[in-house]
């Protein structure tokens, strides 16, 4: 950031140094000799004559362009001098008493131009060569005879322009082409004829100027509003044709130089202040990083996460690393209630997802470090791995694995993406159930997720589902899991929230089971949890209860792919949905029971294998006695395998299996 600012500063100074001479030497080449600006001021002083005011203003600019075309064959000045001429004309008119409101209303610089471009024609030669212009030249031959000669000229010009640029052209283009036509005709005639033609084209009068006004007249004092020789006089507007002796330009050159230099110095001071402030912020951030690292438990910076065949170090990132990896936080890939997620590419090649926490409480660094210490020890193939964290003043950042295929929500509901197959959906359902089983049964103390939804289920490059945002339960000082008091706001997403939790505000693992059931129903139907303003669970009740209507629940995009075997699997999965979404938590199965039934529905061999393993270990035999699987159309669960111990501030789920991960 500092290097970029310094480079920008040097480039700015170099640009100003190269542009300063051109700014000081800039001059408008248009000749306004004999232009009666006093007449313009008189006409424009009457607000009822706005149209006439604009015609006079336009006429004087057009005759000056015609004179310039006589010398250069160009219909106006070059682009780099256009703004200079407009500014000079505006100042000159103000010197004669024409108000800024008048020049603004008439569009000096936007409608009244000093550079004519008529459908790509910018020179006298191009206009003469355009089709139909010869007819205009013949009808506008001067001097005009008494009668309808002017009208004949105008009608010829109108016909020419309509054929040239079309009848539907906007007014600005039409006016520009009219001015270009006049300038082309007037560029090859004398001043008297040019003024006569001007009166016809713009319907203006009183333009006759005494011949002596065209001779050089010395101005006794510098005028504050001269343009190419324009200076107010006591009798009439008279102009000197020699710009080299114009005192106005001699006084403007140092003025412009002083202004540009002052602006450059001001910008230099501002940039120096900004650079010093940024340096100070970065120094403070690095100092804070060093300080907070001392408060992090010693196990955190060197904690290793071993998952399958990969390993990576959990570490603390500096704020500078965060800003560089996210391009100053300009790589947003997602946003939710708990923070904004950015894609980050670190210098060591690590590609990660960085979550900036939205709601940061007045939480001590040690408390935050203890919580991320808890999260860092959660490692499972179906949980998004936490790679590290960052603390910057009151800002908190969490660094996770980057999931290439986005969220389940994107694949189910995004327009233009192919829908996941039935097999892929069931695989995702089992992956999520595995993650929840780990949180509920294999952590010590057990954890609840609290916000299971399709957008929190991420997919890696192989479409392995991983649960994210599982850090919503906080660790207390004694190591137990803490939740907010009863009067806290309800957390979760509409459509996924356990209705029992909404009433009691007491969180249990059965709340996760309910949310999982909604996700499972979302996988079956391909519809959102709240669809068309209605709750998906309530909307699906009549299909859940009748086996004959199970197939009607299926996403229409994949319904044809479900065969007889898939139909039996569908019946089992629908039964799981119905049981998971029971209104009372005690009527719902545990996630372990859900996982077993899903695995059996996908692979019948799994049932015998699971039974053999359980008999071998022995610890789960009492749970199986509580699970009643009836033959027929549906499976009914008995009492849950886990009893919930409820507390406002802490809770733990009993029956954590032996060899469960402890921290």
Swiss-Prot record:
Residues 327-609 form the Protein kinase domain. Residues 640-652 have a biased composition (Low complexity). CDD domains: STKc_IRAK. Its EC number is 2.7.11.1. Residues 26-254 are extracellular. Keywords: ATP-binding, Cell membrane, Glycoprotein, Kinase, Membrane, Nucleotide-binding, Serine/threonine-protein kinase, Signal, Transferase, Transmembrane, Transmembrane helix. GO terms for molecular function: ATP binding; protein serine kinase activity; protein serine/threonine kinase activity. Residues 1-25 form the signal peptide. Residues 224-243 have a biased composition (Polar residues). ATP binds at residues 333-341, 355. It catalyses: L-seryl-[protein] + ATP = O-phospho-L-seryl-[protein] + ADP + H(+); L-threonyl-[protein] + ATP = O-phospho-L-threonyl-[protein] + ADP + H(+). SMART domains: S_TKc. InterPro entries: Kinase-like_dom_sf (IPR011009), Prot_kinase_dom (IPR000719), Protein_kinase_ATP_BS (IPR017441), Ser/Thr_kinase_AS (IPR008271), SPARK (IPR043891). Glycans are attached at residues 36, 46, 70, 101, 171. PROSITE patterns: PROTEIN_KINASE_ATP (PS00107), PROTEIN_KINASE_DOM (PS50011), PROTEIN_KINASE_ST (PS00108). Its main location: membrane. The chain crosses the membrane at residues 255-275. Residues 213-243, 631-663 are annotated as: Disordered. The active site is at residue 451. Belongs to the protein kinase superfamily. Ser/Thr protein kinase family. This is Probable receptor-like protein kinase At1g49730. It comes from Arabidopsis thaliana.
């Amino acid at each position: 950031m500092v290097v970029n600012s310094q480079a920008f500063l040097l480039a700015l100074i170099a640009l100003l140094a190269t542009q300063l001479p051109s700014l000081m030497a800039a001059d408008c080449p248009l000749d306004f000799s004999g232009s009666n600006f006093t007449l313009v001021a008189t006409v424009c002083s009457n607000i009822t004559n706005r149209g006439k005011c604009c015609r006079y203003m336009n006429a004087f600019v057009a005759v000056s362009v015609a004179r310039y075309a006589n010398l250069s064959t160009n219909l106006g000045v070059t682009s780099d001098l256009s703004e200079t001429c407009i500014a000079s004309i505006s100042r000159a008119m103000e010197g004669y008493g024409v108000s800024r409101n008048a020049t603004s209303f008439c569009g000096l610089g936007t409608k009244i131009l000093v550079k004519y471009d008529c459908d790509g024609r910018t020179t006298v030669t191009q206009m003469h060569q355009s089709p139909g212009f010869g007819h205009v030249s013949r009808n506008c031959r001067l001097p005009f005879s008494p009668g309808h000669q002017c009208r004949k000229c105008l009608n010829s010009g109108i016909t020419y322009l309509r054929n040239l640029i079309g009848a539907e052209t906007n007014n600005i283009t039409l006016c520009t082409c009219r001015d270009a036509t006049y300038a082309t005709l007037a560029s090859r005639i004398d001043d008297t004829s040019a003024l006569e033609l001007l009166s016809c084209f713009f319907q203006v009068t009183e333009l006759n100027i005494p011949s002596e006004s065209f001779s050089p007249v010395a101005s006794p004092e510098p005028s504050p509003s001269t343009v190419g020789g324009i200076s107010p006089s006591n009798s009439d507007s008279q102009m000197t044709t020699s710009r080299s002796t114009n005192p106005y330009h001699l006084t403007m050159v140092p003025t412009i130089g002083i202004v540009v230099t002052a602006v450059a110095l001001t910008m230099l001071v501002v940039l120096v202040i900004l650079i010093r402030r940024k340096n100070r912020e970065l120094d403070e951030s690095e100092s804070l990083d060093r300080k907070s690292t001392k408060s992090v438990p010693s196990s955190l910076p060197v904690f290793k996460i071993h998952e399958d065949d990969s390993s990576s170090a959990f570490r603390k990132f500096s704020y500078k690393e965060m800003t560089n990896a996210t391009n100053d936080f300009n790589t947003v890939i997602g946003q939710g209630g708990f923070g904004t997620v950015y894609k980050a590419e670190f210098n060591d090649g690590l590609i990660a997802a960085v979550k900036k926490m939205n709601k940061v409480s007045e939480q001590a660094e040690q408390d935050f470090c203890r919580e991320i210490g808890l999260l860092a020890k959660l490692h499972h193939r179906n949980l998004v791995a936490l790679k590290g964290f960052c603390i910057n003043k009151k800002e908190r950042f969490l660094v996770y694995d980057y999931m290439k295929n986005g969220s389940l929500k994107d694949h189910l509901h995004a327009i233009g993406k192919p829908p996941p197959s039935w097999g892929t959906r069931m695989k995702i359902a089992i992956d999520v159930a595995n993650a929840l089983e780990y949180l509920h049964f294999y952590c010590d103390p057990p954890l609840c997720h609290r916000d299971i939804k399709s957008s929190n289920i991420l997919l890696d490059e192989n479409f392995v589902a991983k649960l994210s945002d599982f850090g919503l339960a906080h660790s207390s000082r004694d190591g137990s899991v803490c939740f907010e008091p009863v009067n806290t706001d309800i957390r979760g997403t509409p459509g996924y929230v356990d209705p029992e939790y909404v009433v009691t505000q007491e969180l249990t693992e059965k709340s996760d089971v309910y949310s999982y059931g909604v996700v499972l129903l979302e996988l079956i139907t391909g519809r959102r949890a709240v669809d068309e303003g209605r709750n998906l669970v309530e909307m699906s009740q009549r299909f859940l209860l009748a086996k004959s209507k199970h197939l009607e629940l299926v996403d229409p995009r994949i319904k044809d792919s479900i065969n007889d075997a898939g139909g039996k699997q569908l019946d089992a999965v629908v039964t799981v949905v119905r049981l998971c979404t029971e209104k009372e938590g005690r009527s719902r199965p545990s996630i372990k029971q859900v996982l077993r039934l899903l695995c059996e529905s996908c692979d019948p061999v799994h049932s015998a294998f699971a039974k053999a393993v359980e008999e071998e270990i022995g610890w789960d035999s009492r749970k199986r006695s509580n699970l009643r699987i009836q033959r027929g159309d549906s499976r009914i669960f008995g009492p849950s395998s886990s009893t919930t111990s409820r507390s406002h501030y802490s809770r733990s789920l009993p029956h954590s299996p032996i060899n469960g991960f402890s921290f």
